[in-house]
Amino acid sequence: MGFKDIAMFNDSLLAKQAWQLLKHLDSLLHKVFKVHFFPNCTFMEAKHLSGGSHAWNSILHGRDVLLMGCRWRIGNGKVVSIWQDHWLLRKNMPQVLSPTVETLVGAKVEILIKEDTRQWDYNLINGMFTPEEVDLIKSIPLSRCEAEDTLFWPFISNVIYISKSGYRFLKSEE
């Protein structure tokens, strides 16, 4: 099959299950896990539970694998954290490296978008980020309508997670 590291292959398969939970909110798997393990939050916010099943804890491990590689596509910016999430379109470091502005520690990307024009607020961006990151942010297209932020898998052309690309990603991270 071409897999040399069975643990890494297993991690890529667990990430596939996490992707299914993330993208298929109407699935029976999502509904059952939602009731039992994350009734008051989203799958992305769910925590490891000491009394959680092995299956649940394994899928959360798969979610962590996904989060290492996934990127956020900016819609309205209401979900994506400026300094913590992977939203910059650069290969090796998709997080913002510019120093955090103390008063904006938990801020979301939405504060960088002008509400009336749905364009980047260049004055704000130029004052908060390094020149390289300013250019990266300005190169991110924004939706004219208020779309939701979505996660995507950037390592294949159709941006949908598949185990093979997950395995390759994990091998490249070694």
Predicted regions and their residues:
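A helix-boundary/hinge signal
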Residues: 1-174
